Regions:
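N-terminal alpha/beta PP-like core and its mobile active-site loop of ThDP/TPP-dependent enzymes
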Residues: 1-151
Length: 151
């Protein structure tokens, strides 16, 4: 299985797990690192995808959908400072007890802290304004379906 196929498989299982937990909408700000997740969301029949070029606007749009629907909404960004653009909406969601699921792509761990393009210290970026923060592993040679669905 190619690296791209492994990334898509893991992303599909992640998205399917989120759908099983009530996800119906996702707001995507396209970027190369988040492509597997964006494609999985786009191809999932239960998810309505909203594309926004600006990450901050996308996050607030997602917050509006989540508040209106009472259901979790995903917001997807690529790596680096794109993830930081979500913080204002994440704080608003936290304060209003509204569920946003931030899916922020990142560089592989070996590219962190070495000056790689679009790389910041992403794990834990939202601090105390989230219930859970997971630094998902790079999908291995045989991604574990159940593990990715449970993330």
């Amino acid at each position: 299985m190619s690296e791209a196929d492994r990334a898509f498989a893991a992303s599909w299982w992640l998205v399917d797990g989120l759908v099983r937990a009530g996800l119906e909408h996702a707001c995507v700000s396209p970027g190369s690192r988040s492509t597997p997740v964006a494609l999985a969301l786009w191809r999932h029949p239960a998810v309505k995808v909203h594309v926004h070029l600006d990450e901050r606007s996308s996050a607030f749009f997602a917050l509006g959908i989540a508040k209106a629907s009472g259901r979790p909404v995903a917001v997807v960004t690529t790596s680096g400072t794109a993830a930081a653009e979500l913080l204002p909406a994440i704080v608003e969601a936290w304060m209003s007890r509204t569920t946003l699921v931030a899916l922020t792509a990142d560089r592989p761990p070996e590219l962190r802290g070495v000056g790689a393009n679009q790389t910041i210290d992403q794990p834990g970026i939202f601090g105390s304004f989230v219930h859970v923060s997971i630094d998902a592993p790079v999908p291995g040679d045989a991604p574990d379906e159940e593990r990715w669905r449970e993330l």
